Amino acid sequence: MKPPSSIQTSEFDSSDEEPIEDEQTPIQISWLPLSRVNYSQFLGLCALPGCKFKDVRRNIQKDTEELKSCGIQDVFVFCTRGELSKYRVPNLLDLYHQYGIITHHHPIPDGGAPDIASCCEIMEELEICLQNNRKTLIHCYGGLGRSCLVAACLLLYLSDTVSPQQAIDSLRDLRGSGAIQTIKQYNYLHEFRDKLAAHLSSRESLSRSVSR
């Protein structure tokens, strides 16, 4: 009897008799609605495509083809180069390029948060993607910590009316209770607007002094 398609048998089969096959299930993309921040688009979040680690046996070619068939035009990757090697997808960024997907690589340490200058750069690039109506996806390793943090920051960046807790709740409703995983990420989100304002102010002051 064939198991239900929703069960990924490679995760449950402990037999050593057969080599572990790649998972056949399509990569799961969660779509965050941006209507509350006055954008009609959705932002995609997912786990690392092609990942081979412990019980996870994804196929990099199939996953990338799936993203392309979903119409993904831009992808933001928050894994470090070291992680891409560890999870056996060292050429993922090149593969995206081969498929014509614009790649934005902003490495953030696992469990961590970007410095405010890097985060501001990510926000500005994401906003340009949305303004140009480009179908955009973001991912880290599990699609829960760094990706959800960046998505929550985007909600705060695009709207003054969304509170940090509302942003967290939106991501946890979408990705589960594991979204925004560490105290560092939680605190970062609550301090985001103040740090962003200070960063933009200092950047503006520097720009004025240079132009004199």
Swiss-Prot record:
Disordered: annotated segments: 1-23
InterPro entries membership: CDK_inhib_3, CDKN3, Prot-tyrosine_phosphatase-like, PTP, Tyr_Pase_cat, Tyr_Pase_dom, TYR_PHOSPHATASE_DUAL_dom
Subcellular localization, as worded in the UniProt entry: Cytoplasm, Perinuclear region
Region (Interaction with CDK2) location: 1-34
Annotated function: May play a role in cell cycle regulation. Dual specificity phosphatase active toward substrates containing either phosphotyrosine or phosphoserine residues. Dephosphorylates CDK2 at 'Thr-160' in a cyclin-dependent manner.
GO cellular component: cytoplasm; nucleus; perinuclear region of cytoplasm
Official protein name in the record: Cyclin-dependent kinase inhibitor 3
A Pfam short name: CDKN3
GO molecular function, one term: protein tyrosine phosphatase activity
Enzyme class: hydrolase
Keyword Transmembrane helix: no
Top-level taxon: Eukaryota
Amino acid composition bias (Polar residues), ranges on this chain: 1-12
Signal peptide positions on this chain: none
Domain Tyrosine-protein phosphatase: 32-201
EC number assigned by the record: 3.1.3.16, 3.1.3.48
Catalytic activity: O-phospho-L-tyrosyl-[protein] + H2O = L-tyrosyl-[protein] + phosphate; O-phospho-L-seryl-[protein] + H2O = L-seryl-[protein] + phosphate; O-phospho-L-threonyl-[protein] + H2O = L-threonyl-[protein] + phosphate
UniProt xrefs under PROSITE patterns: TYR_PHOSPHATASE_2, TYR_PHOSPHATASE_DUAL
Family membership noted in the UniProt record: Belongs to the protein-tyrosine phosphatase family.
Active site as annotated: 140 (phosphocysteine intermediate)
Keywords: Cell cycle, Cytoplasm, Hydrolase, Protein phosphatase
